[in-house]
Amino acid sequence: MDDLVFAGNKALYLVLILSGWPTIVATIIGLLVGLFQTVTQLQEQTLPFGIKLLGVCLCLFLLSGWYGEVLLSYGRQVIFLALAKG
């Protein structure tokens, strides 16, 4: 039972860590674009969306190798825990 709780806890932690970086990037880009729009009095609605989309895609592309390593390591841990119990 403790192993199941450990695996669930680790999964929630990984979701928090892995989703944190794109969220931080989108927030920073949104603030910068909003500041730019305020200073220039630009009223374009789709500008922040497009720039945030590009920023998050770039972030996911750059971190994809690390994401793969982390998820593969977690999958191995869960499989080893399951095999040790069974």
Swiss-Prot record:
Changing residue 28 to V: In strain: s3041 / Serovar V and s3044 /Serovar V. One of its GO terms (cellular component) is plasma membrane. The chain crosses the membrane at residues 16-36, 53-73. It is found in: Cell membrane. GO terms for biological process: protein secretion. It comes from the Bacteria. It is a multi-pass membrane protein. Keywords: Cell membrane, Membrane, Transmembrane, Transmembrane helix, Virulence. InterPro entries: Bac_export_3, T3SS_HrpO. Coiled coil: none annotated. Belongs to the FliQ/MopD/SpaQ family. Involved in a secretory pathway responsible for the surface presentation of determinants needed for the entry of Salmonella species into mammalian cells. This is Surface presentation of antigens protein SpaQ. It comes from Salmonella enteritidis.
